[in-house]
């Protein structure tokens, strides 16, 4: 039911496989921007390592090949733990832009980082200009 509704809203087929994801930028015009939100610790790790074992990671890889922006909206309980190194790698990766993020519960979950999803649209606007919306570190 959800997939049917998504197709109705977008007018496009839902991308469900890695093979489908590979074809998106090869058939016609490439996407202007790809938004991955929420970007979990697992997604960040795989992207930082160059893995493309899911449709969304393959889409990101295709975007990088076409020099197009990828916007990430972090949502991970381990952002200031083991995932911090992956965030660091991605912060310095060409064509990766972050929705500003911060600690959502510094005392209850001190390693948790979550994007300010209310800043998604301004982040996309800046990413299309090849700029990172600042400040990238925000107080929640």
Region spans (language model):
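A cross-family phosphate/adenosyl-ligand binding-site feature
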Residues: 1-54, 61-70, 77-140
